Amino acid sequence: GWIAFLWWGLGYGLAVIGLLAASFHLGNPKNALKAFSQWRTSWLSREAWAAVLTLLLLAPVALSDWLGLGWPRVIGFAGAVACFGTVFTTSMIYAQIAAVPRWNNWTVPAMFLSFELTGGALLSGQTLPALIGCLALIAALYAHYTVGDVAFAKRGQTLGKATGLDIVGAASVFEQPHTSPNY
């Protein structure tokens, strides 16, 4: 009924907002449709295809839930797998950027998938899976920061190199992010 409509509407709304937001990463958002043509070499293109496929796979399930049709859930399982694929392709957009050593490693997909599983469990009110997901997420974040720090140091990165100011001397933070103590 209407509860299913609201939940599916929320999911579809967030997915569409995410796709629209992603189109602003492009140099010219009017050319967003061209992003679909590079699926053989571009993780961004694969993400676009995966997201559209996921939305299309889940549309019959959403319609069945909303109208109480009781259609078989097989397509829903395929849609769930497609959701994982979409989040994985999104993570690979970041993981393949060699210029950012903290991202250019295996921990990025692990972190994204942990966020996905934990968020899904929380939104669906699944207490034990949400707790397990939070623990997995903590482990994934710890691994990400540990591996990222090593990768950053291995490449000899510094604040000066990151800002391009290393040719002038040692770079430092001009002003701290806040001026009063934390609570």
Where are these regions (language model features)?
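Alpha-helical transmembrane segments and their helix-start/interface "positive-inside/aromatic belt" motifs
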Residues: 2-9, 111, 130-131
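Transmembrane-helix bundle segments that line or gate the permeation/cavity pathway
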Residues: 1, 7-31, 47, 51-65, ...
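Generic, ordered loop/turn and secondary-structure boundary motif
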Residues: 27, 37-40, 44
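Long, contiguous internal "core" modules enriched in hydrophobic/ aromatic residues
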Residues: 40-42, 50-183
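Broad hydrophobic/π-residue packing in well-ordered secondary structure
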Residues: 24-26, 32-33, 95-96, 112
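Perimembrane loop-to-helix junctions flanking transmembrane segments
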Residues: 2-4, 34-40
